């Protein structure tokens, strides 16, 4: 497997092992209304401090137990105006690089610094992840290639699951120099991809609209399927006579009927073939809504109509912070909710080590309230 090399890699490749264990000290807790209260024994945690040390501190209790990890790390676009300092020139990062990387750190490019920062954190996140768990990482084009490369190395190329494309803008940016960048990526890796199974997404009203019942079939709504397929089938070549008398000599060139002639006649006898209103169409097997799965397999293209856009996220943050905007690139609540719907169970442990405005925690609490679950963050 090809690996990515950068200045400082040799110094950080095993740095996660050198990070000291810190004891997490419980300072205070909040009740369900967000008010400060006495310790209520909640297992949810918001940890304040260096996330590298925080991740190491979680290992004794949570190694191999976290079902779903979502992180939104710095995109490394050169923006210095936010809490994580997007071009990785934060004084704390500089100090850390000097201590860990040494003099080489003085010659690091922006990308070198970002990789040095991310690598040990990903190593610890991999240890925390459950065998049947998955990590979702938001990123854009600036570091997508580098992130995919080091994730291949940390999690194993065989554990790559998907690259989700989130369309984050609902209108083009007229100030764009070349193209209006309307999407971000969400990179998905499993601890063991063969053991990870996503939850299916609820069927939407739009998807269900494809099911109709033009012949008033007592079995209810259905949609037509294509009888022909390109996969070779030894029994998939035969002529068909329509109710109108039209003869179809066989499937289209380069394709085969999906079922044998015997099976086709069984389906037709059971009223599961649609010939069109005049009985002259190429036959189409019916797929009944009552017989399909309750949900659909998650897709890799997420539209802003489904999961929100950047303006939604900013409105949500302003409503929390009395009109202030302390975070430049928040993620909408519905985006995080979609990830948790796919990747968590009702009693899962969920981790976000670049927590920002706390949208992940918000989503966990709301989902628990909605379905009576016991997810923890």
Locations of regions flagged by a protein language model:
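DnaQ-like (DEDDh/DEDDy) 3′-5′ exonuclease domain used for proofreading
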Residues: 1-70, 75-120
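Conserved S-adenosyl-L-methionine
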Residues: 4-6, 13-14, 91-92, 115, ...
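Glycine-rich adenosyl-nucleotide cofactor-binding module
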Residues: 36-60, 311-349, 366
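Phosphate/ATP-binding catalytic cores across multiple sugar-kinase/actin-like superfamilies
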Residues: 54, 58, 117-122, 128-129, ...
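Conserved proline-anchored active-site loop of SAM-dependent methyltransferases
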Residues: 64-82, 151, 350-364
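Conserved Class I SAM-dependent methyltransferase catalytic core
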Residues: 103-104, 108-163
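Class I S-adenosyl-L-methionine
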Residues: 161-188
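Active-site-adjacent helix-turn-beta-strand microarchitecture at beta-sheet edges
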Residues: 191-318, 322
């Amino acid at each position: 497997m090809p690996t990515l090399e950068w200045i400082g890699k040799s110094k950080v490749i095993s740095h996660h092992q050198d990070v000291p264990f810190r004891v997490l000290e419980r300072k205070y807790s909040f009740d369900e209304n967000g008010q400060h209260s006495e310790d209520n024994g909640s297992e949810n945690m918001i940890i304040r401090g260096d996330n590298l040390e925080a991740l190491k501190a979680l290992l004794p209790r949570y190694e191999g137990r976290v079902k779903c990890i979502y992180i939104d790390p710095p995109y490394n676009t050169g923006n210095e105006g936010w809490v994580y300092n997007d071009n990785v020139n934060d004084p704390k990062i500089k100090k850390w690089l000097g201590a860990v990387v040494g003099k080489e750190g003085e010659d690091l490019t922006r990308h070198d610094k970002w990789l040095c920062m991310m690598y040990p954190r990903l190593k610890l996140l991999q240890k925390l992840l459950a065998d049947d768990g998955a990590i979702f990482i938001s990123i854009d084009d600036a570091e997508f290639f580098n992130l995919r490369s080091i994730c291949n190395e940390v999690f194993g190329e065989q554990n790559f699951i998907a690259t989700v494309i989130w369309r984050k803008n609902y209108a083009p940016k007229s100030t764009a120099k070349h193209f209006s960048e309307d999407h971000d990526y969400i990179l998905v890796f499993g601890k063991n991809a063969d053991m990870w199974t996503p939850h299916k997404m609820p069927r939407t009203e739009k998807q269900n609209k494809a099911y109709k019942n033009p012949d008033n079939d007592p079995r209810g709504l259905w949609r037509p399927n294509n009888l022909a397929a390109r996969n070779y089938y030894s029994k998939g070549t035969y002529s068909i006579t329509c109710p109108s008398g039209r003869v179809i000599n066989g499937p289209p060139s380069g394709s085969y009927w999906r079922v044998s002639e015997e099976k086709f006649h069984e389906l037709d006898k059971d009223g599961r073939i649609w010939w069109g209103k005049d009985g002259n169409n190429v036959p189409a097997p019916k797929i009944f809504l009552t017989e399909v799965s309750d949900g659909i397999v998650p897709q890799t293209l997420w539209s802003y109509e489904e999961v929100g856009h950047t303006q939604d996220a900013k409105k949500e943050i302003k409503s929390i912070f009395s009109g202030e905007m302390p975070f430049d690139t928040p993620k909408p609540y519905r985006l995080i909710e979609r990830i948790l719907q796919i990747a968590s169970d009702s009693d899962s442990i969920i981790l976000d080590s670049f927590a920002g405005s706390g949208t992940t925690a918000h989503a966990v609490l709301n989902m628990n309230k909605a379905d009576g679950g016991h997810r923890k963050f």
